[in-house]
Amino acid sequence: MTEMFKERLADVIRRPLITEKATKGLDINQYTFEVDHRAAKPDIKAAVEKLFDVKVIGISTMNPPRRSRRVGRFSGKRAQVKKAIVRLAEGNSIQLFPDSES
């Protein structure tokens, strides 16, 4: 684990990604998260295991390129985003959606 995230593992994971492709991965126990772009795989594994109390068996990460944005005559870049696909051990799961009681 890197020194940067040793104190605050909660800063590693920003939010879960809920897309059509990520939702299909839930059937095979894969969860997709947006993570800090400086986080390494051991940081992500430690954060998921501690925050959600599950056993992680594999992590795939990807750094898509930053996209350009333009507002009027001003151009810039969107924030750097890193995605992590986390595979959990059999029998473990993460509750992403609250139970509806209606």
From Swiss-Prot:
Pfam hit, one: Ribosomal_L23
Keywords: Ribonucleoprotein, Ribosomal protein, RNA-binding, rRNA-binding
GO biological process entries: translation
InterPro entries: Nucleotide-bd_a/b_plait_sf, Ribosomal_uL23-like, Ribosomal_uL23/eL15/eS24_sf, Ribosomal_uL23_CS
Origin superkingdom: Bacteria
Keyword Ribonucleoprotein: yes
GO MF, any single term: structural constituent of ribosome
Keyword Transcription: no
Transmembrane segments: none
An annotated GO cellular component: ribonucleoprotein complex
Primary role: One of the early assembly proteins it binds 23S rRNA. One of the proteins that surrounds the polypeptide exit tunnel on the outside of the ribosome. Forms the main docking site for trigger factor binding to the ribosome.
Assembly and binders: Part of the 50S ribosomal subunit. Contacts protein L29, and trigger factor when it is bound to the ribosome.
Family, similarity comment: Belongs to the universal ribosomal protein uL23 family.
Name of the protein in question: Large ribosomal subunit protein uL23
Gene name of this polypeptide: rplW
